From Swiss-Prot:
Gene Ontology BP terms: translation
Region of interest called Disordered, as start-end residue ranges on this chain: 48-70
PANTHER family in the cross-refs: MITOCHONDRIAL 28S RIBOSOMAL PROTEIN S21, SMALL RIBOSOMAL SUBUNIT PROTEIN BS21
Any GO CC annotation of this UniProt entry: ribosome
Keywords: Ribonucleoprotein, Ribosomal protein
Composition skew (Basic residues), residue ranges: 48-61
GO terms, molecular function: structural constituent of ribosome
Alphabetized InterPro entries for the sequence: Ribosomal_bS21 (IPR001911), Ribosomal_bS21_CS (IPR018278), Ribosomal_bS21_sf (IPR038380)
NCBIfam families registered for this protein in UniProt: S21p
Protein family membership: Belongs to the bacterial ribosomal protein bS21 family.
Keyword field contains Iron: no
Protein name (record): Small ribosomal subunit protein bS21
Highest taxon of source: Bacteria
Organism of origin: Thiobacillus denitrificans (strain ATCC 25259 / T1)
Length: 70
């Protein structure tokens, strides 16, 4: 669990911003959202496979030469 020590004469919103940034860096909120409901192992594998296919197709699209515009 990330923690932030509030420095002397530091505004609360600055400390809160540092805390939010540390939580985001650790990935706590994304893990919490993923564990909110039970996901069957087959559904998890299917979701991860679909994400991998999407990433691969996106990578291939970015590597292709753009069409000639004339």
């Amino acid at each position: 669990m990330p923690h932030v020590k509030v420095k002397e004469n530091e505004p609360f919103d600055v400390a809160l911003r540092r805390f939010k940034r540390s939580i985001e860096k650790v990935g706590l909120l994304t893990e919490l959202r993923a564990r909110e409901f039970y996901e069957k192992p087959t559904a998890e594998r299917k979701r991860k496979l679909a994400a991998a296919v999407k990433r691969q197709s996106k990578r291939l699209r970015s590597q292709q030469l753009p069409p000639k515009m004339y």
